[in-house]
Amino acid sequence: MALEDRCSPQSAPSPPGCLPHSPPQQHQHILQPNLRIHAIPISITALDMSLQPGTAATAATLYQQQQLQHLHQLQQLQQLHQQQLAASAGVFHHPSTSAAFDAAALHAAALQQRLSASGSPGAHSTGACSTPASTLTIKEEESDSILGDSFHNQTATTATEEDEEEDDDIDVDDTASVSGSARLPPPAHQQSKQSKPSLAFSISNILSDRFGDAAKQTKQGDSTGVSVSAAAAAASIFRPFEASRAAAATPSAFTRVDLLEFSRQQQAAAAAATAAMMLERANLLNCFNPAAYPRIHEELVQSRLRRSAAGNPNAVLPPTAKLTEPSVEKSALGSLCKTVSQIGQAQSTTPVTTPSSRPSQLASPPPASNASTISSSSSTAASCSASSSSGCSSAASSLNSSPSSRLAGANNASSPQPIPPPSAVSRDSGMESSDDTRSETGSTTTDGGKNEMWPAWVYCTRYSDRPSSGPRYRRPKQPKDKTNDEKRPRTAFSSEQLARLKREFNENRYLTERRRQQLSSELGLNEAQIKIWFQNKRAKIKKSTGSKNPLALQLMAQGLYNHTTVPLTKEEEELEMRMNGQIP
């Protein structure tokens, strides 16, 4: 932009002996077609005025003419901007435009005083060219330097005034692109907002130190391609941000390797948590853990001891009260489980022990499996204090060990066979219907080939994701105690009664209470007999016709109403097969 070029502190003239290093300038493309500003080509001697000391007077004259032309153009631009502000009051302008044009007005007044005082070009080469980004007021010396070096790119052009008149519709910068130096496209806000009658630019482009440094580097660089790419990046509207991002010295601390390592650690932690959760779930589902189910474990061991005591009368059976001394009242669940567990088993006589024999039983504990059961039950403190230390240690290890190690320890320590968990019978006992027959018989075959009776309440615990759907097995039908004499005799209707009932049925299939009472008095029958006859007659007609309501057809198609008493029609069979997915 022309305004940016005039107000930018980075475009000061170079000191003598060096090439000019101001960034490539873009003129403001004025949007009104009748007001266009064209650069008047100046002689090439204005560029190398500092390199030819012999032609100092000519260079000073040309430089003064150039300054006057710039002043005239700056005044025109200021008037144009004031007209635009008056015409488009509702358009939002960048907050930096007013400050920039105030600085331009101050600059014009100062320049006129300087030119009236002395026209020497050396006075305009004051070297302040790095204004801080926070400064919004441009000093007089810097303003002179800015104006002195603002149109260096236009002095190097070789186009004539006729060429500029032909290229009226082209930006002023395009006429200067024939020079040897690499020119840049106009900024993004000039390319995309040609139709908007406003002057909007960023204050960071004017007051940025980084952009001036980047422009110097691109001017002094040897590689043309690198300088063009860096200057193109700096020519966008976010030039300071692009330059600072490109000049980042330290890379990011969070690299791709760190990201992969972090994701790998997360996956490992998730896998460990999943494994621990699955192990805990397996321990709870595959066996009756004594810590989780103390009552169930106690009942299992009690039923096992009863069976072993029935086979071996000399076996020592600890009384039940010994296992549940702290809980004086027996829970209803435990009593019910014991009662159910004794169904279908041989009744064993439990030896009654006197209180004097209890210390001897505690002093000589039963096998290790019983000791571990006692220590893991509700009377842990009383049992562990009297039983051997080996029994307590085996109990403590059995609480924390896996089911397989617990079973192996019981095999090594005790002579009787351990009770296998329900998972040994069926892993998916809640899903399959094959366990219905097992629960009816109540016997399973262990690894040793020995037939063992399981208590019936074991199969009441369901490991299923389905809701409750009734009993787990079919109950055997109870033998009917009623004899044929107690049954109600079948009513034998006479021909006159049947004829009258049929005639009434043909008139109306449903009887009212008054009509039923009249028929009862006329035919000498009970009201219940007449009502039942009408119900049976309606059912026979319904079966013979085979017509079903739509709800029954829908339920049959879903398999929820599959009564086989009525044969299905072809349409119903086809509908049912289609609903079941047998036919497409």
Swiss-Prot record:
Annotated compartments: Nucleus
Protein name, per record: Segmentation polarity homeobox protein engrailed
Start and end residues of each stretch annotated as Disordered: 1-27, 141-198, 343-380, 392-451, 465-492
Gene: en
Low complexity composition-biased segments: 348-380, 392-405
CDD domains: homeodomain
Principal subcellular localization: nucleus
Biased amino acid composition, Basic and acidic residues: 478-489
